[in-house]
Amino acid sequence: MGKVVGIDLGTTNSCVAVMEGGKPTVIANAEGFRTTPSVVAYTKNQDQLVGQIAKRQAVMNPENTFYSAKRFVGRRVDEVNEESKDVSYGIEKAGSNVKLKCPVLDKQFSPEEVSAQVLRKLSEDAGKYLGENITQAVITVPAYFNDSQRQATKDAGKIAGLEVLRIINEPTAAALAYGLDKKSNERILVFDLGGGTFDVSVLEVGDGVFEVLSTSGDTHLGGDDFDRCIVNHLASVFKSNEGIDLREDKQALQRLTEAAEKAKIELSNATQSEINLPFITATPDGPKHLDLNLTRANFEELASKLIDRCRVPVEQALKDAKLSTGEIDEIVMVGGSTRMPAVQELVKRVTGKDPNQTVNPDEVVAVGAAIQGGVLAGEVKDILLLDVTPLSLGVETLGGVMTKMITRNTTVPTKKSETYSTAVDGQTNVEIHVLQGEREMASDNKSLGTFRLDGIPSAPRGVPQIEVTFDIDANGILSVTAKDKGSGKEQSISITGASTLSDNEVDKMVKDAESNASVDKEKREKIDLKNQAETLVYQTEKQLGELGDKVDDSAKAKVEEKSKALKEATSKEDYDSMKKLLEELQQELYAIGSSVYQQPGNQPPAPGGPNANASDDKGPDDDVIDADFTETKD
């Protein structure tokens, strides 16, 4: 099999790594950076931009620039009411699914499609680095992602043209990277605060075995929320001074968001940050500017509730693992948001330990994913990974109660069967409602979907025996089967709500992505051809000027004619003519170069140096040599 890359598909930034020579290597993108912004944009020319280039133009194109798509992946419209208010692009409803509105293309994208474009760029950049086409990947997800979000991430990989060999939890990946060379047993707590999600996992690591003891988290907490605190503060101050709410202007909101992120990063190292946004808006009285000084203490006060929310999952994970803080050997910090001093102080206060900062919080998850990819490809031996399911799984039973079949923190893969029966006499079918969560009532948990089993022989209530089996694979993705013991018939059931996209939708998106990829490739090739043509025209003019009368008039006229024709073809964007003329002009230039060297006095130096072919017949000036030498006489 080919190389398997590990991809950390982040809310804010993403990263790709691969195993090389038995060691994980982070791969820089085409722009030379080791992380890539998880941003996709479409310009007025309908060109697609991904990564840094998309992020740079966001202020001027807020409605067609998509970021933080991970917050919407695998979720329903009614689950993202708050998040949808905090982005500059439009969120629309398609049934119960989330769609991202792209006005410039007059179409809608699913969040999975946007994530797929980021995955495609990462895999293509990795392919260029490795010199081969990348088709297989291990992709990370927050440990607290539910079944729908995991399946949606897998769909995004498929749309990007990747076979997703494994979905792996981000804290587990970080532990793999941290503990790869550890021989002695350690109990570690991974504190993973990223751009949009927060996870805590407790693991036992040592001698190639990575066992997850517990996991907890909050999929609604991350760096974006800390940015939003600053955005709301800036907007409130400006509104009180000027009477204008900047959050209602998409372009102003985008500028506020970028300024907030910049200030947050600065305040991790400095005690204050100057926020200056000239011409942020305008009134009949003229332009308005925002100029404000934000101190670290002020920021920590604004974000105090968010910081406090980080405490509960830590305590829950320790409780579920049945460990005290004194039994934890190391605290591993993961995610860019862990650079905030207030977060580090909270961890120290809760655990009584200084966090271990030997790993790169932006890259460690991708490194761990690459190691898991190496395991699956057979490159890495003697690694055993035992992960857990983050949330309980069960079914709705009489009275609207959730009956748990697989409890949270159960090691995966796992399989569990329970037998259920009918509720009324003569019932010939049952509807089973599959749930995920920790609440007692079915309505308070995440619905993964319902399925119906027909053909049950008519019998008094309580007599039929329907065996329902829950099967969680190594990706943490659930499948359900049902068997009627009376008739002996067994049926495999697909949970219809497990993903927000149907198989047909995914297949269509795969085809669209492949089609767009070929269009994008053609555009790049045309741009490269145009650049080559313009460069050659410039070099031709320069070369003719430098050579002057060394070029005979007929050859010069021929070159000038070709150069002029190429210039015209370039301005008309006639790519077929450009390609033909480019080759012809290069041949004419080669001919000129050869003729110049063949002229007397312009012989090129011989391979051995300036005197390699010197004869013994010396002319009057042949004794003059610009070189140091020693003459030895016998």
UniProtKB/Swiss-Prot annotation:
The keyword Transferase does not apply. Induction: By stress conditions e.g. heat shock. The modification Phosphothreonine is found at residue 197. Disulfide bonds: none annotated. Residues 619-634 have a biased composition (Acidic residues). SUPFAM superfamilies: Actin-like ATPase domain (SSF53067), Heat shock protein 70kD (HSP70), C-terminal subdomain (SSF100934), Heat shock protein 70kD (HSP70), peptide-binding domain (SSF100920). GO terms for molecular function: ATP binding; ATP-dependent protein folding chaperone; unfolded protein binding. Residues 592-634 are annotated as: Disordered. Keywords: ATP-binding, Chaperone, Nucleotide-binding, Phosphoprotein, Stress response. InterPro entries: ATPase_NBD (IPR043129), Chaperone_DnaK (IPR012725), Heat_shock_70_CS (IPR018181), HSP70_C_sf (IPR029048), HSP70_peptide-bd_sf (IPR029047), Hsp_70_fam (IPR013126). NCBIfam families: PRK00290.1, PRK05183.1, prok_dnaK. Acts as a chaperone. Belongs to the heat shock protein 70 family. HAMAP family: DnaK (MF_00332). This is Chaperone protein DnaK. The lineage of its organism: Bacteria, Bacillati, Cyanobacteriota, Cyanophyceae, Synechococcales. The gene is dnaK.
